[in-house]
UniProtKB/Swiss-Prot annotation:
It is found in: Secreted. Glycans are attached at residues 149, 354. InterPro entries: ArgE/DapE_CS, Bact_exopeptidase_dim_dom, Peptidase_M20, Peptidase_M20_dimer, Peptidase_M20A. Pfam families: M20_dimer (PF07687), Peptidase_M20 (PF01546). Zn(2+) 1 binds at residues 171, 204. Its main location: secreted. One of its GO terms (molecular function) is metal ion binding. Residues 1-19 form the signal peptide. GO terms for biological process: proteolysis. This is Probable carboxypeptidase PMAA_093910. PANTHER family: ACETYLORNITHINE DEACETYLASE, PEPTIDASE M20 DIMERISATION DOMAIN-CONTAINING PROTEIN. It comes from Talaromyces marneffei (strain ATCC 18224 / CBS 334.59 / QM 7333). Its EC number is 3.4.17.-.
């Protein structure tokens, strides 16, 4: 590729992006198309500079890069949040910084949501939302190209297959970046479109950001929005529903003693083990035998004993033991599942009062949640993971929708199978296809709610 032949177009693209804060100039994206076409026709093997050039010359890919380079593990979202505020304000957005956790005495620890909309349209009707936080550990941003099998197709389409890795590259900074670009590009053609963006903290832990937003004045009563599009890794499919979630801790108390004389003590581990063995089977045994129900739509409920802590040393009879358990619920009745768990533990331990259950999330748990899938042209699937969409509780009212309810969608680039893993990564094509997908959902929402 001849860089010199691209330089005027690149300078035009960069200049247009920086010089005008409002994205009202449709021509500014045209040079990017030329760059894409020329990049995809290069026959020489691309080098590191070629990969970086693709990122640098794309508003979408460079924004995604900038986001992933921030370490924003849950609780540490402030830096990436400040960056997003500046980015959106420079593009003529009104940004409301919603403080969720205030700064500490030394100015540390501030956590905030970002609620943004064009200055020209202060009441969004369509809201796109995702989260700024990631799971640990931080993995630096990097670029790579999957090995080619030597085919002509591979050599021509190398740009689409560039692999962008790093923590959050999929979950969920891919959604954040593609949602922003979708909104900017839609506004270029429809400058008065009432669109909004909501980026929250804490989705990966406790949903604190969405809970705070849901209880705030920004979640208006009655709703002003008629559509909310949540961004998570769905492999560019519309999700018709995801499982609920129930966390709990099961603990046992014992009495410490020398391991050479275990009869002088009481092992908390021995008390806990029968309960864990029973719990481990609850999603696999028939309901009539005390198992946890599933559903036709979401399949089986699943149970995971994710952490066990006990004792202080191998030569001491353990005086305490506990396990953390998570059930992914395909069944709608959370209270019924809690009854099933309680009964199973009681039967397995013969009613041992030293074994107790502590329900997480203030004992509430989350039932499965459904989403809309009424837009043509998308694959439709269900997922086993949960999102913070459960926490967004709409007030009574139609949100301007003739159907009398707020429509919700779950969609985004990347695969959940690599999210949270050491190999978290996404391709250029997935990111760019997501922008088109989000714009299609936006357009369908406005078409559906035409008066």
């Amino acid at each position: 590729m001849k860089v010199s032949s691209l330089l005027p177009s690149v300078l035009l693209l960069v200049g247009a992006t920086r010089a005008s804060p409002h994205p009202a100039q449709p021509p500014q994206q045209q040079p990017l198309n030329n760059i894409i076409e020329e990049s995809n026709t290069q026959t020489n093997p691309p080098n590191k500079h070629d990969l970086e050039h693709v990122i640098d010359t794309s508003p979408l890919l460079s924004l995604h890069r900038d986001l992933v380079k921030f370490e924003s593990i849950s609780g540490n979202e402030a830096d990436v949040g400040d960056f997003l505020i500046q980015y959106l304000q420079a593009r003529d957005f009104k940004v409301e910084k919603q403080i969720v956790v205030p700064k500490g005495p030394k100015g540390q620890g501030e956590r905030f949501n970002i609620y943004a909309y064009p200055n020209s349209t202060p009441e969004p009707r369509v809201l796109l939302s995702s989260h700024m936080d990631t799971v640990p550990p931080y993995i630096p941003y990097s670029l790579d190209l999957p090995s080619s099998n030597g085919s002509t197709t591979d050599s021509l389409n190398w740009r689409d297959n560039i692999l962008i890795a790093g923590r959050g590259s999929v979950d969920a900074k891919a959604s954040v970046a593609s949602q922003i670009l979708a909104v900017l590009e839609y506004l270029q053609l429809h400058p008065e479109a009432p669109l909004g963006l909501l980026f929250v903290v804490g989705e990966e832990v406790d949903g604190i950001g969405m809970q705070y937003f849901s209880q705030s004045e920004l979640n208006t009563s009655p709703p002003t929005v008629h559509t909310v599009i949540f961004g998570e890794p769905t492999e560019l499919a519309l999700v018709s529903g995801h499982k609920g979630s129930l966390f709990f801790k099961i603990s046992a108390k014992g009495k410490a003693a020398h391991s050479g004389y275990p009869w002088l003590g009481q092992s908390a581990v021995s008390a806990l083990l029968p309960a864990l063995v029973k719990l481990d089977t609850l999603a696999d045994i028939p309901v009539e035998d005390g198992g946890i129900p599933g559903s036709e739509k979401l399949g089986k409920s699943t149970i995971n004993i994710g952490r066990i802590d006990a004792g202080i040393a191998s030569n001491v009879v353990p005086a305490s033991a506990e396990a953390s358990v998570n059930i992914r619920l395909a069944y709608h009745d959370v209270e019924k599942v809690k009854e099933i768990v309680t009964k199973a533990v009681d039967e397995a331990t013969n009613g041992d009062e030293n074994v107790t259950i502590e329900w997480g999330n203030k004992g509430k748990g989350h039932a499965p949640i459904d989403f809309d899938t009424d837009v043509d042209g998308f694959k439709v699937m269900t997922v086993n993971y949960a999102t913070d969409a459960w926490y967004l509780k709409f007030h009574e009212g139609s949100g301007g929708s003739p159907e009398g309810r707020v429509h919700t969608y779950l969609y985004g680039p990347g695969s959940i199978f690599v999210a949270h893993g050491a190999d978290e990564a996404i391709t250029v094509r997935d990111l760019e296809d997501a922008v088109s997908g989000y714009k299609k959902l936006i357009e369908a929402a406005f078409e559906r709610n035409k008066v």
